[in-house]
């Protein structure tokens, strides 16, 4: 897969628990090092519970707080990156399509061009309904990278689909 080097990046991550909580710090570091504009949106309607502390990337001080907000604030503060979070579950296709809609960024220079964001939808969810929603959003999109991750106690998988126009 070849990514365009001249487009801003937008990552929308659904799920901030077992998988998303551990993926987030690496994505923050990666986006921080890019030589182009980048946005990171973390979505999850769940709160940190005591049972999450042994297998998710949270600490006792996070108990009762929204998972998306905790991750967004923790890592954006450390790296000085502005991050968006949605403290709700994404349950409808219109909600998801609005989240993955690319913004235009001014590229500057003599001609003052605009470039659309390259959007990456990252599924870190633990339910089939949201996976189906992501798949439908991918099917209706014209320009999207969709990465879905899932795991059980002893197994896991990652699936990547791409519709990138260079």
Where are these regions (language model features)?
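Glycine-rich adenosine-cofactor-binding loop
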Residues: 10-29, 44
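A short, basic/flexible loop-to-alpha-helix module at the beginning of a structural domain
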Residues: 1-11, 30-33
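A structured beta-alpha segment of the ubiquitous adenosine-cofactor-binding alpha/beta core
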Residues: 66-117, 125-127
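Conserved small/polar residues in nucleotide/adenosyl-binding loops
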Residues: 164-166
């Amino acid at each position: 897969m070849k990514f365009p080097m001249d487009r801003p990046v937008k990552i929308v991550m659904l799920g901030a628990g077992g998988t998303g909580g551990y993926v987030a710090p690496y994505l923050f570091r990666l986006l921080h090092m890019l030589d182009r504009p980048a946005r990171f949106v973390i979505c999850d309607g769940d709160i940190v519970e005591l049972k999450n502390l042994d297998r998710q990337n949270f600490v006792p001080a996070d108990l009762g707080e929204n998972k998306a907000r905790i991750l967004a604030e923790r890592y954006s503060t450390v790296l000085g990156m502005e991050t968006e979070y949605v403290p709700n579950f994404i349950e409808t296709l219109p909600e998801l399509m609005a989240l993955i809609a690319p913004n235009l960024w001014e590229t500057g220079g003599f001609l003052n061009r605009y470039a659309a964001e390259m959007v990456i939808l990252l599924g870190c969810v633990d339910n089939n309904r949201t996976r189906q929603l992501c798949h439908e959003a991918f099917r209706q999109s014209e320009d999207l990278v969709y990465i879905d991750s899932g795991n059980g106690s002893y197994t896991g998988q990652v699936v990547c689909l791409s519709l990138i126009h260079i």
